[in-house]
């Protein structure tokens, strides 16, 4: 029977990862995700796993690379500036087709920024986590329950597609407490015949590597990898719709900002405005199919974010000039209020000819 408990978001992430079969965690303390690492330091040894506080974020991601190469389910976590330091290692994992899970509990930036919640790493997560030609699935929870659900799913995605996967949370979700139904522990994990555990006469000699010195070989592998990305784009788009069936104004928001946007949508409906919420759960692949469905009745889209305007680029690409696209955001760790978003909805409605 599933267990329901009251937990912080960071702790729910950690416990769910353990139940997903994660037995190697390598981290480094940074606000606002330190509780995740602290929880792992207590729980991991009790279940026969390995917790190691690395000497740096760079070391931590390369330890994930090593554990993943040996076929283990491994994870690291950090917050915005720490994720930047992990970028090279994430690229190496992508180039070696290694599964692993990276948690980013975002804070304000750029630079050292602040310790308040932010969503300013959207571009980094979906476009430029590291150098080279690669993508990785990015999941965006909006509740403590989804913090648990997303990391549980992330390990399966990582193994299925042999890719790093990121859970993009934020300091608000990491620090808040809500009831969460924890998933059942996985009883079996997929076999990984490619892992460096000895071939035992069952396969050819194998080296896990991202270095290819001939251009043709590297191009061939990149093309094969992008064919896999197309499968992910087709099969793994996830989103949630709220009051969207007849919406003429579609608010698009993810993570913590979607909670605020939801309240604003309810308030706008009470004033007679036909507005709904589209909440991307996968940021990559972006839920273009849901945008396409909404275009059958939407006259305008409003992207609400805790940054200066990043996801709005993907909204514009998906809409492709067929409706107006507006943006409202707060930055630096400031959380928008429902009243602010309601005002932005009314402005979009006027520009879209709805009011």
Place the predicted regions along the sequence by residue.
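Redox- and metal-dependent alpha/beta enzyme cores, enriched for Fe-S-associated oxidoreductases
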Residues: 239-278, 284-290
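Conformationally flexible catalytic loops at phosphate/diphosphate-handling active centers
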Residues: 162-241
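Peripheral docking tails and interdomain loops at the edges
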Residues: 305-355
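Glycine-/acidic-rich phosphate or pyrophosphate-binding loops and their flanking alpha/beta elements
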Residues: 8-12, 226-249, 262
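Glycine-rich beta-alpha junction loops
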Residues: 107-109, 169-176, 255-257, 308, ...
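Thiamine diphosphate
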Residues: 1-128, 135, 143, 331, ...
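Conserved thiamine diphosphate
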Residues: 116-170
């Amino acid at each position: 029977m599933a267990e329901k408990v009251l937990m912080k978001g960071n702790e729910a992430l950690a416990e769910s990862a353990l139940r997903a079969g994660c037995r190697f965690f390598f981290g480094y303390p940074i606000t606002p995700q330190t509780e995740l690492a602290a929880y792992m330091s207590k729980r991991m040894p009790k279940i026969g796993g390995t917790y190691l506080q690395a000497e740096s974020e760079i070391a931590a991601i390369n330890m994930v690379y090593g554990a993943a190469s040996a076929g283990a389910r491994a994870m690291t976590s950090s917050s915005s500036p720490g994720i930047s330091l992990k970028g090279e290692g994430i690229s190496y994992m992508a180039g070696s087709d290694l599964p692993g899970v990276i948690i980013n509990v975002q804070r304000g930036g750029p630079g050292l920024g602040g310790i308040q919640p932010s969503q300013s790493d959207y571009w980094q997560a979906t476009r430029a986590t590291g150098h080279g030609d690669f993508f990785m699935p990015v999941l965006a929870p909006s509740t403590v329950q989804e913090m648990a659900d997303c990391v549980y799913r992330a390990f399966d995605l990582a193994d299925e597609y042999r890719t790093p996967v990121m859970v993009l949370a934020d300091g608000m979700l990491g620090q808040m407490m809500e009831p969460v139904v924890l998933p059942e522990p996985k009883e079996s994990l997929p076999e990984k015949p490619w892992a460096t555990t000895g071939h035992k006469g069952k396969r050819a000699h194998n080296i896990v590597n991202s270095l290819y010195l001939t251009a043709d070989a590297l191009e061939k592998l990149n093309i094969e990898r992008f064919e896999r990305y197309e499968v992910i784009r087709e099969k793994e788009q996830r989103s949630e719709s709220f009051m969207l069936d007849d919406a003429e104004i579609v608010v698009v928001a993810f993570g913590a900002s979607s909670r605020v946007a939801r309240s604003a949508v309810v308030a706008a409906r009470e004033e007679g405005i036909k507005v709904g919420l589209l909440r991307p759960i996968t940021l990559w692949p972006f839920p273009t199919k849901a945008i396409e469905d909404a275009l059958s009745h939407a006259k305008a889209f409003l992207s609400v974010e805790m940054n200066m305007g990043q996801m709005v680029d993907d909204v514009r690409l998906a809409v492709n000039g067929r409706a107006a696209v507006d943006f409202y955001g707060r930055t630096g760790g400031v959380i928008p209020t429902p009243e602010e978003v309601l005002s932005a909805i009314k402005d979009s409605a006027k520009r879209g000819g709805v009011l």
